[in-house]
Amino acid sequence: MTLDQVLTYKETLHENRIKISSIGSPIGKISIEDPFEEHLALFKHVLDVAVAFESPYVRMFSFFIPEGKPADDFHEEVVKRWNQFLEVAKDYPQITLLHENEKDIYGDIPEHCAKLLTELNNPQVKSAFDPANFVQCDVEVYPHAYELLKDEIGYMHIKDAHFADHKVTPAGLGDGQVEAVLRALVANGFTGFAALEKEGISIEETKSDGEKLFTVASNALKKILVENMGQEWN
């Protein structure tokens, strides 16, 4: 996406009173063994896009680990590359970098996420906490993953999944303990965003209808927040 395109899209969004909370970037979604210089240049462009959209967050990853190799063997290289991201990002202090736990990257389990964030020790980096992705890595989301990352969570992804087959479901219909996480976040004073995701949800009656899938996902979240937790829905 060019910056000229961004300005066009931004005008349309403004006309419809829509704002962008986060840029869902592909940064860090390459192999840890891939060349890095071009990717670092792309990262700067993503930051420029975020500025143009007035988005306070950029979602990122911590690199795919080669199959069959221990993720811990690449910890130092992951930290090195993220520190290079932060060196660029310091010129964009209004933007927070979000590390998403994604299957098969370095930070796909909470222990690695916590280790990375602790070593970076930078307030410009937070966790984008995704319950479904943890389930797909056979990780207990609550209390285990939440307790390890609760002080670093800056953004929530709302989707769920089953341990048995790793299929994604609407919130509350899987094993991701989404309601327990949301209750804990509220109790902990969380004031960030929650991004509702329909991607990956497989429900026969909706087939590939994106609008229907979003409605299903939205209704599932509304049930948790309004009916179960007594929160407002505006």
Predicted regions mapped to residue ranges:
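Short, conserved glycine- and acidic-residue-centered signature motifs
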Residues: 2, 39, 74, 78, ...
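Active-site acidic/histidine proton-transfer and metal-coordination neighborhood
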Residues: 7, 12-15, 29-127, 136, ...
